[in-house]
Amino acid sequence: MIGTPYTEGARRAMLLGCGELGKEVAIELQRLGVEVIGVDRYANAPAMQVAHRSHVINMLDANALRAVIELEKPHLVIPEIEAIATQTLVDMEAEGVNIIPTARATKLTMDREGIRRLAAETLGLPTSPYFFCDTETEFNQAISEIGVPCVVKPVMSSSGKGQSVIRDIALSHKAWQYAQEGGRAGGGRVIVEGFIPFDYEITLLTISAVNGIHFCAPIGHRQEDGDYRESWQPQAMSDEVLAKSQAIASKVVEALGGYGLFGVELFVKGHEVYFSEVSPRPHDTGLVTLISQDLSEFALHVRAIQGLPIPNIHQHGPSASAVILAEGTSSNIRYQGIAAALEAVNTQLRLFAKPDIDGRRRLGVALARDIDIDSAVSKALDSASKVKVIF
């Protein structure tokens, strides 16, 4: 049963993290009559602008996190970012609070070590070779064993922060320092991974719902500086590779438990598929589903977490997204060229309405459909290029 917002019978959902992905989740929740409470570390975050009300707290402060959950008494607590006091969520789940998809899934996936050990050591899934390192001495030893090229990432980071590829061992110290600066909790543990010369990488959006496991068509994407720049759907792949990808994703999602949409990242090399990472929530590369599917990844997530069925997922055809990226410093961001960006048929824009910028920041995304993937990507890039960010 779903009541009406602001009434005694309302179903309340709390978003922990109010960025652009959380904003779309908030909109989908409201479409089903759910009262939405946004929580983040800064005011006027995108999802806060569409939530019924919001709170600003330090998300890593266990006491502050507990206090806001106890104050609002939400029926659903939906983590939308990794930088949260996850042990508090584990404790509160044991007290009866409904954490989406589960507190264990949130805690395991908040750092790369938990999910990599689950995938490789518990589930026996194929991954790149890896070492976890606490000191630069361990780091150098790991590089010597894995060899170059290799990939270095903080165990806790997002959007490519602190991530680099070492192609020359002489640059290892620089990579160590960069990883220490890029972690969400400051300096600390890193993962060194063998570099897989993959043919392509995909995100397989996998939904655990009341009526079973469902998959969206695979999403291909291009990364730059550890962050996505374009994504497209469907990614062309053989039936054999798709079946292997779905089998890996199913194992990971079932091991994590709970209902919801999971973004499973995979590398494909020839006929082999390697597990990379997973997010127990909508994925940034999945923004393409806002134009490519009848039910976006956000709509699917909101259905699943409320125990609602997913009878089918319709994919409209070759589609793409291209990021609108800006760099600068401002608290008065404006946009020009919107009309030009929307001139072509089957194009859409999402401007995230982020309140400020200090450095490089993703401020929106252009979406497009066309007769084939190359045309869709080209159209999305052209649309994105016409949006001018004014400071």
UniProtKB/Swiss-Prot annotation:
Keywords (A to Z) from UniProt = ATP-binding, Ligase, Magnesium, Metal-binding, Nucleotide-binding, Purine biosynthesis
Give start and end of each ATP-grasp domain.
Answer: 117-306
Q: Pathway, per Swiss-Prot/TrEMBL?
A: Purine metabolism; IMP biosynthesis via de novo pathway; N(2)-formyl-N(1)-(5-phospho-D-ribosyl)glycinamide from N(1)-(5-phospho-D-ribosyl)glycinamide (formate route): step 1/1
What positions does the entry give for Mg(2+) binding? 265, 277
The EC code for this enzyme is 6.3.1.21
Q: Which reaction does it catalyse?
A: N(1)-(5-phospho-beta-D-ribosyl)glycinamide + formate + ATP = N(2)-formyl-N(1)-(5-phospho-beta-D-ribosyl)glycinamide + ADP + phosphate + H(+)
* Domain of life where this protein originates: Bacteria
Instruction: Using the UniProt record, name the top-level EC class of this enzyme in a single word.
Output: ligase
- Membrane-spanning ranges: none
* Keyword Ligase found: yes
One GO biological process term is:
'de novo' IMP biosynthetic process
Q: Name one GO cellular component term.
A: cytosol
The protein's matches in SUPFAM superfamilies, at most eight in alphabetical order, are given as:
Glutathione synthetase ATP-binding domain-like, PreATP-grasp domain, Rudiment single hybrid motif
- Tell me how this protein assembles: Homodimer.
Task: Please describe what this protein does.
Answer: Involved in the de novo purine biosynthesis. Catalyzes the transfer of formate to 5-phospho-ribosyl-glycinamide (GAR), producing 5-phospho-ribosyl-N-formylglycinamide (FGAR). Formate is provided by PurU via hydrolysis of 10-formyl-tetrahydrofolate.
What is the protein name stated in its UniProt record? Formate-dependent phosphoribosylglycinamide formyltransferase
Q: Which organism is it from?
A: Shewanella baltica (strain OS185)
Q: Which gene is transcribed and translated to give this protein?
A: purT
